[in-house]
């Protein structure tokens, strides 16, 4: 990996870790997209740290959303997570 590349990993406790790498040019373009998309928001995404938090929270959001969709099939308390900052 080169400086600025991104590594995304999902680890299951007691299991294996799956990892993908994204090159720095892709990260720069993705950040530019989010900066433009959120430019009118009260807290726009302008930095790598803000983009990282946005991406990790996006992934967590989808995992929790999919889990909570199973309420129709099984009975349990809806799940939540603590967002990264």
Residue ranges and their predicted role:
Residues 1-85:
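Viral virion structural and adsorption modules
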